[in-house]
Structures are given as C-alpha cells and as structure tokens.
C-alpha cells in the first residue's frame, strides 16, 4: 500500500497543473488534507480515501471539501461510487486553485503512463443545459459526447446545473456510465453548495475523468475476513450484508431504502407543510400519516420499486443496493420528504416531477425543498403575493380538505414555477447570497419577518442550512458542520450538555469514515473496524485517531453557529419537548 498521497493541483485559469506528494501520517485522507489545502489556498478539493478500489465495501466515495458558499464555513460533501473511476487516475486528490475565464470543462485522463492529461476546454453552457432533459443531465450528455472517444474505459462526469449560477446552494451531480451510456442511478454531492463554488469561484461547469492506472489496492479477502471473524465472528461480506439491511430490504417493515424504512416508521413524527404539522394533535398526525403516507405515498413506492426490485448501486460493488428507482426517478428519503410532504406533496407522480426538475437544475434537493416550503408558507399567510415571486398560483395546504392526488399535483406545479423564479430571479427573488440575506432585505423594505417561518440552522451572518428531516433537537444543534449527520439525530430526549457530548462523538465518528472515503451506510462495522484496519495495514492506528481528533478540533475552532433566529426553529424544539412529555410519556424532568 502507498505511504504517500498524491495531490494534483490544477489552475483552471491557465490549465497549469503540478503534482505534490504528502506522506501518510501527518494527513490521512481527503478531509484532513482538504482542510489543510482549503486553509492555504481557499481551494475546492475532491478525492478518495486510502482504501479506494479495495475489497472494503463502500470505500469508493468521492469526498469534496472547501469553504461552503451557503454554510460560509468549512464543509464536507460526498458522492457515492464516483471514487471508483477516480482511483484509475492514480492520485488521491484534486485541488482547484484559480478560475477559468469562461465556463469550462476540466478533462483528466491517464492512459498507460505516468502522466495525467490535464486540459481545460471552454463550453457553450447554455446549449449544454438545453440539451436533452436539460440542466445537469444535458451537460453530462454534452461532455460525454465530446470526450468519450478519448477514454479506453468508461469515464465519470461531474456536472452542475443552472442553480450553480443563480444561487449559493447548487449541487454537483454525477451518474455511473456503463458501456458508454449514462445510467439513472445519479449520485450527488449536494449539501454545502459546492456546485455553486465550482462554477462561480473556479469557472468549471463539468469535470470528466478516467484512466487505466492500476495501483496496489488492498485485495486480500482472507486477511480481511480474519479481522472481521475476530471482531464479529462473521466474515466481511456477512457482516456488511447485516449492517446494510435497512438500505437493501428490511423484512421488519416489508420495505427498504431510506425512503421506505423512514416513511414507514415516522408516524406521529412526520413533518409536513413546512412544519405546520408541529401544531397538529398527535391523533391528526397519525391519521394523516396513515392516509396520505402509508396508504398512498409509501404504498406507491413499495408497489413500483420494492416489489419490482428496481434497485442498483451508486456505481461500486456493494450489497446495500441503496439506489431505489422507478424508471429515471431515484427515491431517497430526504429529497422526497422536503420536495414531498414538506411542500404539501404526498403523491409519487407529483414528487417525481418536482424532484427531477430540481435535480436537472442542479439544486441541493434538501435545501431546495426547505426553501420552496418556506416560500409556499409565505404565500399561504400572505406575507408574499404571487407577483412578488413571479408566479401565478398559491399552495393548497388545507389539511381538512386536502385531496392527495389533485392537491399534490397542484403544489408540485407551484414548486416548478418557484424553481424557474429562483433560476431567473423573477419578481425580485434573488437567492444568489442565500435566503437569509434576501429575507432580511425584504424585512427592511416591507416590515415582514419572513425568516420566522424558515426552518434552518444559521452560521455566521449569512450561512444557512436546511436541517436533516428528523423531528429532534439535534438537527438544529450549534455544530460546526450541519445538514449532514455530524450530530446526534435520534428521537430520544437528551439533556443539552449530554447532547453536546453525543454530537461531538458523532462528529468524530463521521469524520473517521469520511476521511477514508467510506460510505456511512456501512457504519455498522466501519466505525469500529476502520482504526483497526489502518493499524493493520499502515501501523498507524493511534496516529489516525489522533489526526481525526485534531481535525475535529480545527474544524470546530471556526464554529460560528448562531442561536435559532426563526420562530419556526423555536416551535420545532418546543413542540418536540411537548410531544416527548405528553405522547411518549418521557419522565425526564428536564
């Protein structure tokens, strides 16, 4: 195994590049090395962990790091499976420093040699975004058609959509390419707005990469099985199969994937209509969850996706089969929650249209859903008129008269209008510097406290993040990175100081996996075994754990979390506590 990490520095303004080696020990992976480079160069970095290409399941995530345009602090985002092709370049990390003078595509290829071909090509972005299905998908098709003939094996493409130009929460999208065709199992580095950073700060709309390099990856299954049998009395494959049950198929709930298991178990903890469900009685939440979610939204998913076994991986060999699909529509819990019930949508056809449009535009889907739901509530309570947003309709959010199919379709059409309004800044809807700044400007001009109904975590003066979709205080905790799972998000009540300790522990455990490029869906073994594996392969177990602790401390030293600034945030926590006391009968006096 290599004892150095190879970093390719690329300046998109000139096409100049250089390779630098960093020994394993001072830095172990794309997170701690990315933090070091971001601090020095304000770069956008992406790369893989030390075990990319190995037999360890979930080891091929592509990790992005840098200072986030929407969170306004150091951030980490990751993309499933995209590291498998990246490993064929024979490097560990790419660091972008500088900006192309026009929207461009970065071409990276390594064919039977020591040198990596690095080229920056200008791109007709409007034409690419208009091709085929449009946006991210059209851009991927354009780039593949232009460069496919130069690769001996299938490459991988990273692409952004119009949201990267118009907002601070544009995502980076990708999809496995099989036999020259782009598949439907698209994967995203969504949280953190790195698509906006890639285009606005570096002038790159797409990156295509691939190669033929074969390095010395860890492939000894006998050794790996020995580690797992000593710890779990099971071989690696058996333990991983057990650990990924939820994401494949959980017989306890007769469904699978994050969509299936989470929607089946939410019940009275469901979040709908921008969190207005917080004010419903428990009986109302249970009844509406049963009628709208279980009997319709979830039933459609189970019949169309689970029963037909329409599932795949993110592009790497994996037992989880977590990509649940129907045709081109990929079904994950949080996108289909924020661009679903949170927006008043409980029908798969309506949610598919809205999710696909958001993906094509290149938005972080979770943030988009939170913003759309907030704007819809502003229309419901007349804080804003349709003309203020350049749209023609208002939401249908009356739960007593709600028609699942018809009103879901109506609300989805409204969501599509709002997406166009955001992209083209209609009616003064300018989210280029985030919703907090836009909301404060309207407050000064009109006196409306629009941000009071925006459920979000705040960071510094402008930083923001739509929280993970679980009704628990941990998702609004003052942690240095929010919107991922770097905190405790379980349903149990935990006193504040203990919650802080649990959050810190989760932060360290998630860093431990991300810094080695391991998918968190495999955390059932990864959190325990990764330090042991680093120790066995590199002899640096204690050094790795220390490096993770130092990295967590360095990230936390920049923590600029702001106390909850919206009334909806306060309602979120207060109603959670009331439900724990009155419904869950939690006896804790705190």
Name each region found by the language model.
Residues 79-118, 195, 200-215, 371:
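Glycine-rich phosphate/pyrophosphate-binding loops
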Residues 37-70, 103-175:
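Acidic/Gly/His-enriched mid-domain segments of enzyme catalytic cores or analogous surface patches
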Residues 1-39, 88:
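N-terminal basic/disordered segments at the start of proteins
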Residues 24, 30-54, 315-321:
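N-terminal short beta-loop-beta anion/metal-coordinating cradle
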Residues 1, 71, 75-82, 367-376:
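Metabolite-binding pocket within alpha/beta catalytic cores that recognizes anionic/polar moieties
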């Amino acid at each position: 195994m290599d004892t150095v990490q190879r970093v390719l520095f690329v300046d998109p303004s000139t096409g100049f590049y250089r390779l630098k080696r960093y020994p394993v020990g001072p830095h172990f992976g794309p997170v701690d090395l990315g933090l070091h480079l971001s601090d020095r160069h304000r770069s956008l970095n992406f790369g893989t962990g030390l075990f990319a290409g190995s037999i360890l399941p979930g080891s091929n995530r592509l990790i992005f790091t840098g200072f986030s345009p929407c969170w306004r602090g150091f951030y980490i985002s990751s993309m499933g499976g995209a590291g498998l092709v990246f490993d064929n370049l024979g490097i560990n990390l790419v660091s972008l420093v500088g900006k192309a003078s026009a929207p461009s595509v970065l071409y990276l290829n390594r064919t039977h040699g020591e040198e990596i071909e690095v080229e920056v090509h200008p791109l007709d972005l409007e034409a690419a975004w208009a091709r085929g299905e449009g946006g991210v998908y059209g851009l991927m098709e354009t780039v593949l058609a232009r460069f496919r003939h130069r690769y001996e094996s299938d490459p991988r493409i990273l692409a952004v959509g119009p949201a990267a130009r118009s907002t601070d929460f544009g995502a980076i999208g990708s999809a496995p390419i099989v036999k020259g065709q782009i598949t439907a199992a698209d994967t995203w580095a969504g949280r953190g707005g790195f698509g906006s950073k890639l285009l606005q700060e570096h002038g790159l709309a797409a990156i295509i990469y691939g190669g033929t390099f074969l390095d010395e990856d860890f492939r000894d299954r006998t050794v790996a099985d020995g580690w797992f049998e000593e710890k779990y009395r099971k071989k690696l494959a058996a333990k991983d199969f057990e650990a990924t049950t939820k994401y494949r198929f959980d017989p306890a709930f007769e469904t699978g994937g994050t969509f299936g298991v989470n929607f089946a178990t939410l019940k009275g903890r469901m979040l709908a209509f921008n969190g207005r469900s917080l004010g419903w009685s428990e009986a109302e939440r249970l009844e509406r969850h049963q009628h709208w979610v279980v009997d319709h939204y979830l039933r459609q998913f189970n019949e169309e996706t689970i029963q037909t076994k329409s599932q795949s991986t993110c592009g790497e060999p994996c037992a989880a089969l977590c990509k649940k699909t129907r045709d081109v529509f990929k079904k994950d819990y949080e996108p289909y929650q924020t661009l679903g019930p949170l927006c008043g949508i409980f029908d798969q056809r309506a949610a598919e249209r809205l999710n696909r449009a958001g993906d094509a535009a290149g938005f972080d889907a979770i943030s988009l859903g939170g913003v759309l739901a907030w704007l819809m509530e502003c229309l419901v309570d007349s804080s804003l008129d349709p003309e203020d947003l350049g749209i023609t309709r208002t939401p249908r959010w009356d739960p007593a008269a709600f028609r699942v199919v018809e009103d879901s379709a109506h609300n989805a059409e409204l969501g599509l209008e709002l997406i166009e309004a955001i992209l083209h800044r209609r009616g003064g809807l300018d989210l280029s510097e985030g919703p907090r700044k836009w909301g404060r400007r309207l407050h000064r001009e009109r006196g409306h406290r629009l941000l009071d109904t925006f459920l979000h975590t705040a960071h510094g003066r402008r930083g923001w993040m739509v929280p993970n979709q679980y009704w628990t205080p941990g998702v609004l905790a003052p942690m240095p990175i929010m919107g991922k799972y770097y905190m405790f998000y379980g349903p149990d009540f935990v006193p504040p100081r203990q919650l802080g300790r649990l959050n810190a522990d989760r932060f360290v455990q998630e860093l431990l996996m991300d810094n080695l490029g391991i998918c968190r869906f495999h955390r059932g073994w990864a959190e325990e075994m990764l330090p042991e594996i680093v120790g066995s392969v590199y002899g640096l177990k204690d050094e790795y754990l220390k490096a993770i602790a130092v990295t967590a401390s360095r990230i936390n030293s920049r923590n600029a979390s702001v106390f909850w600034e919206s009334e909806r945030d306060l309602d979120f926590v207060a109603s959670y506590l009331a439900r724990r006391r009155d419904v869950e009968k939690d006896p804790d006096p705190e």
